[in-house]
UniProtKB/Swiss-Prot annotation:
Function: Involved in control of chromosome replication initiation. Inhibits the cooperative binding of DnaA to the oriC region. Thus negatively regulating initiation of chromosome replication. Inhibits the ability of DnaA-ATP to form a helix on DNA; does not disassemble preformed DnaA-DNA helices in vitro. Decreases the residence time of DnaA on the chromosome at its binding sites (oriC, replication forks and (probably) promoter-binding sites). Tethers DnaA to the replication machinery via the DNA polymerase beta sliding clamp subunit (dnaN).
Origin species: Bacillus subtilis (strain 168)
UniProt keyword Magnesium present: no
Known outcome of mutating residue 108 to S: Still self interacts, still interacts with DnaA, no longer interacts with DnaN, loss of localization
Name used for this protein in its record: Replication initiation control protein YabA
Location of the protein in the cell: Cytoplasm, Nucleoid
């Protein structure tokens, strides 16, 4: 190998090393950007999961409250409807007390009246 070929080989190696160095720098920068993006995505994911949990808890609480109020309304409505039916039967002339239930009444019954006055 003469000096010129040796010099050309060294220049070629130097260019290859420079190219590899630039590629390594680009790769390092790209990895840094990916790590930063990953960190931001992890934070966003954490916040979204917390928000989802909070929203889910609020929805469950709302459903429970709604179910409870519906149950209370139903109980109140049922009690009111039963009372109204018994009052209607009494007005139509039937006993609603446990002593003479369903029989025709000729005059006011103290048992029936005491039952109607309960709340």
């Amino acid at each position: 190998m003469d000096k010129k070929e040796l010099f050309d080989t060294v220049i070629n190696l130097e260019e290859q090393i420079g190219s590899l160095y630039r590629q390594l720098g680009d790769l390092k920068q790209h990895i840094g950007e990916m790590i930063e993006e990953n960190h931001h995505l992890q934070l966003e994911n954490k916040h979204l999961r917390k928000r989802l949990d909070d929203t889910t808890q609020q929805i469950e609480k709302f459903k429970a409250d709604k179910k409870e109020s519906k149950t209370q309304k139903t109980e109140q409505t049922d009690i009111g409807e039963g009372y109204d039916n018994l009052a209607r039967l009494y007005q139509e002339g039937f006993h609603i007390c446990n002593v003479h239930y369903g029989s025709v009444r000729k005059e006011d019954c103290l048992f029936c009246l005491s039952f109607l006055n309960k709340k």
